[in-house]
């Protein structure tokens, strides 16, 4: 007989960012070069001052006179694409003081403007760069070393893993980004996903795109492509995070925004929800019935919609009676968006059904 689920579930484990992994491995490799000591663990200081000890998978000299160290990325209980990946650093000592960063295998290179890293640079974000620089500077001072460090950061299978992220669309080619602002991955915080939404908007703006489309998934992206012929750089994969798009446009506005999603997702936005995930919002069938009434639905039809099992069934009932429920939902969703984005942004909403057909539009 299966044990009962405990009433108080265990707290979710936090993990460490790729930036923390890069800091730990680069420090361990550099310490081996300066002291001859290979470590099993390495202590680092996170951006907010926490001290953590990170276990290493290896720390060894290389044939070219340098050293390398690696660690297995532990994202805790967060569903992170890099969880379990080997993050490693290869370090060489150089005469010129300071730290030079390079993209090792599995780490991408920036090819488009709009990201916090210059075009042509390895996709190692500012905070991880600062963490590595500070740790290496402290190590050099401790051992009286006046030279510099050449640091290549890599991720095993990073190029394949990157295809599961937004990096290709952002113009980061060849692999993953080394990320993190606090050094810690908090379970289900989705901070990396939201950051990639913001970066997508930044890249579009920096490359002269004036019309972006924020879409909940692949089907909505396909619908937008077919309708407008927008390039990939103009498509923002917002998933469930409509609020992340709308709020960011307050400080990084564009001339035109198209919001496109499945009918059910868009009905949640229309009801005022900015997080469209089922954990945080649900379909309001009584509200859909009320809106159907606004569009001319009879009392009987409203009752049927109220009793529907799903939003798709509610939509099918409305369409069967020639009630444009999709348009009404789009109108309410547009109103919610308009209340958040700057006045100069032209907002359009599109709703699609399960087959990807447009069932509602408000320009």
Swiss-Prot record:
Catalytic activity: Co-precorrin-5B + S-adenosyl-L-methionine = Co-precorrin-6A + S-adenosyl-L-homocysteine
Family label: Belongs to the CbiD family.
Record keywords: Cobalamin biosynthesis, Methyltransferase, S-adenosyl-L-methionine, Transferase
NCBIfam families on file: cbiD, PRK00075.1-1
Any single Pfam family the record assigns to this protein: CbiD
Pathway annotation from the record: Cofactor biosynthesis; adenosylcobalamin biosynthesis; cob(II)yrinate a,c-diamide from sirohydrochlorin (anaerobic route): step 6/10
SUPFAM superfamilies with a match to the protein in the record: CbiD-like
Gene3D superfamilies: CbiD-like (3.30.2110.10)
Name of encoding gene: cbiD
A molecular function (GO) term: cobalt-precorrin-5B C1-methyltransferase activity
EC number: 2.1.1.195
Name by which UniProt lists this protein: Cobalt-precorrin-5B C(1)-methyltransferase
Biological process according to GO: anaerobic cobalamin biosynthetic process; methylation
Natural source organism: Burkholderia mallei (strain ATCC 23344)
